[in-house]
Amino acid sequence: MLLEETLKSCPIVKRGEYHYFIHPISDGVPVVDPKLLREVVTRIIKIGNFEDVDKIVTAEAMGIPLVTTLSLYTDIPYVIMRKREYKLPGEIPVFQSTGYSKGQLYLNGIEKGDKVVIIDDVISTGGTLIAIIEALKKAGAEIKDIICVIERGEGKKIVEEKTGYKIKTLVKIDVVDGKVVIL
């Protein structure tokens, strides 16, 4: 499959002691092949529960191409949690802590009772998903499914234990000896 092939050959950048994989789905560089995006979204649709879903939710930035494509395939509208405040009525701020940053995320466009699916590009520490789940609970949304494309580290387990929600992923990876390994 193209996702796994491109992960195995993607560049690795070391920052401090952490090895980052640089991939079109997680970083938008070097170039996003539409075949790869189509494959990923088709796989998300196959494993996801999109029945009676009102909205698809992601956090900026790399979830945006995923939910845009997914919305076109499913005709379900999407909502993007932004890193900046818009001060719209009902806006919900939540704190986000990831492996590389801390800050606020802001949720708009969710009504009480909305049935939602959460989509994210990568789960590693779980910080982004925990923030999204917290905001959606505050808004009164019903979370029907949570799908991340790439799983790395213990984030999936952390989110499942902390929130009680099951996380689906397309591929689990690690970086070993400067290369991505599919687990």
Curated annotation (Swiss-Prot):
Keyword presence, Secreted: no
The keyword Glycosyltransferase belongs to this UniProt entry's keyword annotation: yes
Predominant localisation class: cytoplasm
One GO CC term, this protein: cytoplasm
Pathway this chain belongs to: Purine metabolism; IMP biosynthesis via salvage pathway; IMP from hypoxanthine: step 1/1
SUPFAM superfamilies: PRTase-like
EC code: 2.4.2.8
Gene3D superfamilies in UniProt: 3.40.50.2020
Keywords per UniProt: Cytoplasm, Glycosyltransferase, Purine salvage, Transferase
UniProt catalytic activity: IMP + diphosphate = hypoxanthine + 5-phospho-alpha-D-ribose 1-diphosphate; GMP + diphosphate = guanine + 5-phospho-alpha-D-ribose 1-diphosphate
Pfam families, per the entry: Pribosyltran
Compartments, record wording: Cytoplasm
UniProt GO MF annotations: guanine phosphoribosyltransferase activity; hypoxanthine phosphoribosyltransferase activity
GO biological process: IMP salvage; purine ribonucleoside salvage
Superkingdom of the organism of origin: Archaea
PROSITE patterns: PUR_PYR_PR_TRANSFER (PS00103)
Family from the record: Belongs to the purine/pyrimidine phosphoribosyltransferase family. Archaeal HPRT subfamily.
Subunit note: Homodimer.
Function: Catalyzes a salvage reaction resulting in the formation of IMP that is energically less costly than de novo synthesis.
Name of protein: Hypoxanthine/guanine phosphoribosyltransferase
The organism of origin for this protein: Methanocaldococcus fervens (strain DSM 4213 / JCM 15782 / AG86)
